Structure formats: C-alpha cells, structure tokens
C-alpha cells in the first residue's frame, strides 16, 4: 500500500509541521509575554517618575508657602524692605512684597509700577484676604514686568482685622526652565 519512503516522508512532513507550529506558538507566546512585561515595566517607571515629580513640586510649593508665612513681622516693621529682600533670597523667588489696606506697598526690589497702583485691587491681595492660609494664584500678567507670574500670598491679621498681605512672585519662565 504505502511505500516506506512515502510513509517516512509523510512522518517527516507531519513532524516538521508540528515542530514549526510549536516554534511559532512558543515565539508568539514569548513575544506576547515580553510585550506585556515591557508595558508593565514602562507603566511602573512612568508612575514612579510622576510620583517623584509630584513630590518635588509639593516640596517646592511648601517651601514658598513657609517663606511667605514667615515674614508676617514685616507688617509691623518701619522699613520692611530688608525683610522682603531676605524673603526673596530664602524663597528663591523673583519678588517679595507686602501690601497694606491703606494701599501702601513695599517690594524687595525697585519696581516700575503703573501710576495709581493699588495692591488692594489685585487678585492676589483679594484672594489672600479671603483665604485662610496661603493662597496660590493662577498665572497672570505681572503689573511691573509684564511677564506671566504666579503669586504665593498670605494675609497677615491682627485677630480678625487684616493688617497686610505678604506676597512672593515666581515668574513662569523660571518655573518652565526648571
């Protein structure tokens, strides 16, 4: 019926096909497992990096909040400029200042403000005056430099009476470069 050589060829062909299918299945499984492992590893590294950046940002914000809270005694100083200059250095910020309800304002550095500048009309002042704790503004255009800036502002109170609002400005271009 079947010659040995023909049966032998059929067995070799069947075994060859089975070996090929086994290798194909094994390769596909290895590829799928490798891809899944690589994606899992990438996800873990991405989450770790995001967590690290989040912690760094939280630490950076907390440091500036601490600095803006720390110079509340500047509200009682006859010349608050030296305290403001020190706060600017300590906070690593672009400008430190303190605004009073009578519309006086003192800065760590000389500012080129528009005529009639009223700190009490500024969003940072109003936000801090109505917030317990340190207020952090959304980016806005700074009145003196015309650059985008964020402000950390803290109301300085005597009981329930507002004495002043202390602020720290950080220019957005500095934040972006870091």
Range-by-range predicted roles:
Residues 2-36:
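Extreme N-terminal signal-anchor transmembrane helix of membrane signaling/transducer proteins, especially
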Residues 44-139, 175:
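Extracytoplasmic/periplasmic sensory segments of membrane signal-transduction proteins
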